[in-house]
Amino acid sequence: MQQFSLSANIEEGQDKDFNYIVTPNAQDVASGIVNGYNSGIHSFTIIGSYGTGKSCFLLALEKDLQSKGQHNLINPQTLSSCKKYEVLKIVGDYKDLASLMRNKLAIDGTADNVLDELRNRYNQAKKRGSFLIIFIDEFGKVLEHAAKNDPE
């Protein structure tokens, strides 16, 4: 029997039985990402209430980007001519973004070190012919932390 859960963790990925149901809204969001990217927008925000499928959307998007077969949301070639996609997945928490990024990237130092490491990973992916995408899920927690601790 298949179990339904309102929450998904993008770092844990999807199990073999992951079956994303593409709704018209999800298709609109995916099309908006592709159209926006192709017109020069490279950062996107997906918002919605708890349990509406934002994390599952990211998992389905990742699956499409890394799949050679059938695509549910987008055909990766409409986004880039790169043959491979690398996805850096971060789940937000009540911490500053630099700390979350340092932890995920397994580095020490300042926010500048984070930017240097991201630049390095981007360049390495590019050398491999890959397209680097960063997913930050639960970003609202990061914003809440910033508002309470360092609103400037």
Question: Residues of each region from the PLM?
Answer:
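Flexible phosphate/Mg2+-sensing switch loops adjacent to catalytic phosphate-binding sites
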Residues: 62-87, 91, 109-117
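Conserved catalytic network of the ASCE P-loop NTPase/AAA+ motor domain
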Residues: 38-39, 80-83, 124-128
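Conserved P-loop NTPase "ATPase switch" module shared by AAA+ and STAND
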Residues: 124-151
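Walker A/P-loop-proximal flanking segment of P-loop NTPase domains
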Residues: 1-52, 58-65
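Short glycine-rich substrate-engagement loop in P-loop NTPases that contacts/grips substrate
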Residues: 97-122
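Residue-level preference for the first positions of well-ordered beta-strands
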Residues: 43-45, 87, 131-133
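Charged C-terminal transducer/switch regions of large nucleotide-driven machines
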Residues: 86-99, 121-125
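Well-ordered, non-membrane alpha-helical segments in soluble/globular domains
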Residues: 26-31, 115-118, 150-152
